[in-house]
Amino acid sequence: MGNSSLYSNIYKIVKHIPKGKVATYGQIARLAGIPGNARQVGYALHSLPDESKVPWHRVINQKGRISLDSARSLQHDLLESEGISFDMNDTIDLKKYQWTD
């Protein structure tokens, strides 16, 4: 699968994450048929144009934390605006907020 079709598949999956839920990079990789390639999901989301409608902000790391340094504040604000709360360590409770695919 080429990057273009792989990225399209990743974007399609991410669009299914409902408002108020999150998924992990690894979870998206598994659903995209590339288990163990969480970084590829990160590369795909990083490639999105600014005006994209893909809810990239709903994808976080396996520890329930935001991985992006450059957009950390924006991602945090977007998630909070959807009703997702963070604990004192800036971690999201995956048992409560993780999307069950």
Label each region the model flagged.
Residues 1-101:
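Nucleic acid-binding interface residues in structured DNA/RNA-binding domains
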